[in-house]
Structures are given as structure tokens and as C-alpha cells.
């Protein structure tokens, strides 16, 4: 059919991103809301995933090596040696590629107080077994990504992205453009270059298959412009998307 060929696709289903020199961020939304807004409107066939079991397995894996967590947390102490929770959660998000929700759970184990973590890991692994068992009782298996499978096929369902998936995507694109620390700020509180980086992150978040860019790096300083150009080239190769890039640089 024409729509399978990519012709006649309704506007809200087109995976197209636009990035201009004048990026229009929503002034009444935080950086986080600006990036996540488009993601919360996506509704399409996706794999059905058992996130609770997946996150329990991930946390169990991390808790088995508590020293790594403690060394990340130790970097987040103020001059009086007190742990700064907000900074610690941001660090855990990036160090272990977690969502803010899972990072908060990890933080709440308070491994910095010398706890071993192995008992908690065992409890989480029991939870993983329960998750696999209840999937089996319902006639499914869980694959290594914790997707529900039946007869070896991944089960698809038309659904919206979960809070967890949205958060992981926001964190992933904010790592690319280095804006993780600005999540709670409003556009007016950012410099032109920072706003430009938010606009880039917002455009990349839904993983467009075609990306139109007109001077997207013009407001960045020379070092960041080079980094972002390299990053866009890498994304181009990694995602296999089509990039149309307009520049007036000689």
C-alpha cells in the first residue's frame, strides 16, 4: 500500500524532525517537559515489556557490585561531606544508564552507609523469578530484553510510551548534548547555546527517520559546534536516518 511505502502517511504518524536556527522552545515548560512533550503523544505498535521485572533485574545486577555505586555517590558530597541527593541521582542516571525512577530506588538503598547490597540483590532476583513465572502462567515467555514473547515472536501492542521509556529517552538525548543538569530550568534561564542544545535534544528524542536541519549549530561555541557535528554524524550512521543539512559555512 502507499502508506507502507511512506507516501500518504498522516502528519502525526510521520517520523520527521525539523531543527532550525530559530528554535522555538515552549517558554512555560521546563527543559525536561520540552523534550518529553512530543514523546508523550506517540502511540504506535510497540513490544509489550515487563518493566517491573526488567528494572528489578537491572538493580540486582548493580547491587552485586556496591563499591561502584559508592564511588559514584562519593563524588556527590558537598564540602562538609554531606551527600547531595539531587546531584547523586543525576550521577547514578548517567553512570548506570537508568531512568530517574530507577536511580531514585538505587539511591534509597543508601549503599554509602556501608550496606552490603547482596541481600537486596537476592530479594530483587526473587522478584525477577516471580515476574517470569507469572508471564509463563499467562502463556508468555520473557526474552533477555524482558519483552513478552509467544511462540518465539515478540508480542506487539499499540500503546503509548511508559514514564520509564520517556525518561530513558530524555536522559539519552540529554547526554548527547550535555544538558542533564538543566532539566528543571525554563528556557529563559538558559543561554542561546544551551537553548539550541535543548532544541537538538527535543528533535532527536522521537528518533525521526528523516531530519531536516537548517544551521542547527550556529549558536554554539566553536568547541561545542565541532562536538555536536561529530555527534550528528555518529547519529546519522547509528540510526540510519536521512539527514538534510543546510549550512552557510564556507
Language model features with spans:
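Nucleotide phosphate-binding site architecture
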Residues: 2-3, 26, 180, 218
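ABC ATPase NBD coupling module
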Residues: 2-17, 41, 46-48, 60, ...
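Histidine-centered active-site/metal-ligand motif
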Residues: 27-28, 96, 110, 236, ...
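Catalytic "switch" loops of ABC-type ATPases
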Residues: 16, 20-28, 249
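Post-kinase regulatory C-tail/linker adjacent to protein kinase catalytic domains
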Residues: 52-61
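ABC ATPase nucleotide-binding domains
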Residues: 33-37, 41, 46, 156, ...
Amino acid at each position: 500500500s502507499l502508506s507502507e511505502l511512506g507516501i500518504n502517511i498522516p502528519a502525526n504518524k510521520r517520523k520527521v524532525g525539523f531543527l532550525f536556527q530559530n528554535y522555538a522552545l515552549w517558554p512555560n515548560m521546563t527543559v525536561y517537559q520540552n523534550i518529553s512533550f512530543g514523546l508523550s503523544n506517540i502511540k504506535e505498535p510497540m513490544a509489550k515489556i515487563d518493566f517491573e521485572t526488567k528494572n528489578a533485574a537491572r538493580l540486582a545486577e548493580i547491587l552485586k557490585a556496591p563499591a561502584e555505586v559508592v564511588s559514584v555517590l562519593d563524588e556527590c558530597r558537598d564540602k562538609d561531606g554531606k551527600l547531595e541527593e539531587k546531584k547523586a541521582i543525576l550521577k547514578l542516571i548517567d553512570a548506570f544508564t537508568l531512568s530517574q525512577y530507577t536511580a531514585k530506588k538505587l539511591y534509597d538503598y543508601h549503599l554509602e552507609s556501608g550496606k552490603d547490597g547482596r541481600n537486596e540483590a537476592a530479594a530483587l532476583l526473587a522478584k525477577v523469578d516471580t515476574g517470569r513465572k507469572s508471564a509463563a502462567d499467562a502463556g508468555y515467555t520473557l526474552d533477555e530484553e524482558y519483552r513478552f514473547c509467544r511462540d518465539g515472536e515478540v508480542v506487539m501492542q499499540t500503546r503509548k510510551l511508559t514514564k520509564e521509556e520517556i525518561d530513558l529517552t530524555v536522559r539519552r538525548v540529554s547526554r548527547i548534548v550535555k544538558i542533564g543538569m538543566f532539566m528543571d530550568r525554563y528556557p529563559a534561564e538558559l543561554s542561546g547555546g544551551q537553548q539550541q542544545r535543548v532544541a537538538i535534544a527535543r528533535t532527536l528524542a522521537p528518533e525521526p527517520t528523516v531530519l531536516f536541519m537548517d544551521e542547527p549549530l550556529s549558536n554554539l561555541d566553536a568547541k561545542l559546534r565541532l562536538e555536536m557535528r561529530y555527534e550528528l554524524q555518529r547519529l546519522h550512521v547509528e540510526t540510519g536516518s536521512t539527514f538534510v543539512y543546510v549550512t552557510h559555512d564556507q
